[in-house]
From Swiss-Prot:
Modified residues (Phosphoserine): 200
Gene this protein is translated from: CHMP3
Natural source organism: Bos taurus
Protein name: Charged multivesicular body protein 3
One Pfam family named in its UniProt record: Snf7
Family of this protein: Belongs to the SNF7 family.
C-alpha cells in the first residue's frame, strides 16, 4: 500500500515480466491440451480400423467426424500459440522501448494478438485479465466484445465433415474406406456370424465405448 491507503503501481518492467510469465504458463497449458487430444485421436484411429474390419460404416463415419473436430481444435490451439509468441515478442519490444523512452508504448501488434487470444476458450480467462492490465498500462486500447465464435461454426463443421470424411477414412484404413462412402460396405470384410444374443451384447458394448470416447474428446476440446 502507498500513502493514504492507495495501492502503489508496479514498475512497467515488472508488469511486462509478469505478463510474459503468465503467457508462457498458458503456452504450457495449451501444449498439454494438444498432446492430450492427439493421444485420444490415436485411440480413435484404432477404433476406426476395428469398426472397418467389422463392416460398421456408421461407426466409422461418427468417429471420422470426431477426428475432424479434434484436428480443428488442435489447429486453433496451434494458432493460439502463434499469437502468444507474437505477444511475447511484443513484450520484448516494450522492454527495449522502456529502456530508451522510459515508458511503455501502445502496440498494434500486441493488440491484434490479444484480440485473437481472448476468443480461445481454453485460455480466455487469463487473456481477458491480461488485456485489462495492458489497457490500464496503455499498451492496447479497449477491445470490443466481439469475441463470440461464428454462429455458423457447427454448420461449417458438418460441411467440413462431409468434405473430409472420405480422406480421413481412406488415410486410416489404407484405402479400405473413403473413396465412395455410399458404397464402402461393398468393399468391407463381412462381419463374422455371431449368435443373436452375443451380437446384441457386443453392439451395446461398442456403443458404450463409442459414447465414452466421444465424451473424452469433447471434454478435451472444451
Amino acid at each position: 500500500m502507498g500513502l493514504f491507503g492507495k495501492t502503489q503501481e508496479k514498475p512497467p518492467k515488472e508488469l511486462v515480466n509478469e505478463w510474459s510469465l503468465k503467457i508462457r504458463k498458458e503456452m504450457r497449458v495449451v501444449d498439454r491440451q494438444i498432446r492430450d487430444i492427439q493421444r485420444e485421436e490415436e485411440k480413435v484411429k484404432r477404433s476406426v480400423k476395428d469398426a472397418a474390419k467389422k463392416g460398421q460404416k456408421d461407426v466409422c463415419v461418427v468417429l471420422a467426424k470426431e477426428m475432424i473436430r479434434s484436428r480443428k481444435a488442435v489447429s486453433k490451439l496451434y494458432a493460439s500459440k502463434a499469437h502468444m509468441n507474437s505477444v511475447l515478442m511484443g513484450m520484448k519490444n516494450q522492454l527495449a522501448v522502456l529502456r530508451v523512452a522510459g515508458s511503455l508504448q501502445k502496440s498494434t501488434e500486441v493488440m491484434k494478438a490479444m484480440q485473437s487470444l481472448v476468443k480461445i476458450p481454453e485460455i480466455q480467462a487469463t487473456m481477458r485479465e491480461l488485456s485489462k492490465e495492458m489497457m490500464k498500462a496503455g499498451i492496447i486500447e479497449e477491445m470490443l466484445e466481439d469475441t463470440f465464435e461464428s454462429m455458423d461454426d457447427q454448420e461449417e463443421m458438418e460441411e467440413a465433415a462431409e468434405m473430409e470424411i472420405d480422406r480421413i477414412l481412406f488415410e486410416i484404413t489404407a484405402g479400405a474406406l473413403g473413396k465412395a462412402p455410399s458404397k464402402v460396405t461393398d468393399a468391407l470384410p463381412e462381419p463374422e456370424p455371431l449368435g443373436a444374443m452375443a451380437a446384441s451384447e457386443d453392439e451395446e458394448e461398442e456403443e458404450e465405448a463409442l459414447e465414452a470416447m466421444q465424451s473424452r474428446l469433447a471434454t478435451l476440446r472444451s
